[in-house]
Amino acid sequence: MAETLAHRFTEFLLESNALKFGDFTLKSGRKSPYFINAGAFDDGKKIAALGAFYAEKISQAIVHNTIPRNIDTVFGPAYKGIPLAVSTAIALTAGHNMTVGYTFDRKEKKDHGDGGWMVGTPLTDGMKVLLVDDVMTAGTAVREVIPKLKAEANVEVVGLVLSVDRMEKTKDSDMSAVKAVEAEFGFPVLSIANVREIFDAAAKMKNPDGTPLLSHDIQQRAAAYLEEYGA
């Protein structure tokens, strides 16, 4: 039986040292049994593979009519979203016969040369823009970038693709950040894998010495964490 996209992505996260199990304190103050470090994708091989995973998820979403095929540009918010947008656009072209642009924003507006807030494919009225980002915690980055996009041109944001959906409720409600963004902006938010899929996949994996990758303690803590914070 072929492994699912989520299973293969979990293997990739582990091989890249981007996924760690243990005891971590997040920015929110929550004690988490796992941590995802997007900074671990630090060479050409890893970022190319990551872009291919994003492209595969996008291709699946197009087949299921979740997002349209005629995407004009892939947008990644600075800074972490920049290599995601570039590598995803390359992978869509190379592996899925889709020629799309890439665009990202500057943290500070440039007032000379090409100028403005945006770099890459210029945004114009009517363009279909697909957002890519790593992990959503509260949706702050999306809420900051949507007004920037709309100020540039009357574009249509057709969706957002994340690497991982933490599936956690926010501090203010029992709704997850992903569901809150979908409700607020009206476009789908997809992920290559969600945290439950990651733990399900990891629970089936073994260390080189044959012992389970996830200890009984980690599995119990993961279940308790998702019971308390899961949405």
Swiss-Prot record:
Its cofactor is Mg(2+). It comes from the Bacteria. Its EC number is 2.4.2.10. Keywords: Glycosyltransferase, Magnesium, Pyrimidine biosynthesis, Transferase. This is Orotate phosphoribosyltransferase. One of its GO terms (biological process) is pyrimidine ribonucleoside biosynthetic process. 5-phospho-alpha-D-ribose 1-diphosphate binds at residues 27, 79-80, 106-107, 110, 112, 133-141. Pfam families: Pribosyltran.
